[in-house]
From Swiss-Prot:
Keyword field contains Cell membrane: yes
Places the protein is found: Cell inner membrane
Protein name in the entry: Putative biopolymer transport protein ExbB-like 2
GO cellular component: plasma membrane
Signal peptide as annotated in the record: none
Species of the source: Helicobacter pylori (strain J99 / ATCC 700824)
Family, similarity comment: Belongs to the ExbB/TolQ family.
Keywords: Cell inner membrane, Cell membrane, Membrane, Protein transport, Transmembrane, Transmembrane helix, Transport
Length: 150
């Protein structure tokens, strides 16, 4: 059961962090190569910009709960060991509680960067939509030339 907490919960959290990093790299590459003048419809641009961002937000908001699940399982294991042992082994109790807290820590370690990445990507997409607005509804001709290269 300890392996389920260690490899199952923590392994799943590591997998989720890899997904967040992969999406962040893909989105940053997409944003860097995007030309706002390629889109004639703002709605299509917004759809393209927000692709996969919901997944990043979902991972960021749920990773602490997954870590908490690992903590609850680790504490349950500790109580099971206490109940089945004839004597009290403080070292075993502390080891099991440390394992339980490790799951919570991993959940936070995944969640905090995921939320930061999500916020940065949403802000960058808002900037690109604003550049699209400036390009398609210019107030002066100079702004049209500047933002057509974005």
């Amino acid at each position: 059961m300890k392996e389920m907490v260690d490899y199952g919960i923590i392994g799943f959290l590591i997998f989720l962090s890899v997904i967040v990093i992969a999406i962040a790299i893909e989105r940053l590459w997409f944003f860097a190569t995007l030309r706002v003048d390629d889109y004639t419809d703002r709605r299509k641009l917004e759809l393209a910009l927000h692709k996969r961002l919901t997944l990043v937000a979902t991972i960021g908001s749920n990773a602490p709960y997954i870590g908490l699940l690992g903590t609850v399982m680790g504490i349950m294991l500790t109580f099971m060991d206490l109940g089945s042992a004839s004597g009290i082994d403080t070292k075993a109790i502390m080891t099991n509680l440390a394992l339980a807290l490790k799951a919570t820590g991993m959940g936070l370690l995944v969640a905090i960067p995921a939320i930061v990445i999500y916020n940065l990507l949403v802000r960058k997409s808002e900037i690109l939509v604003t550049k699209w607005d400036i390009f398609h509804h210019p107030v002066d001709t100079q702004s049209h030339e500047v933002y057509s290269k974005a």
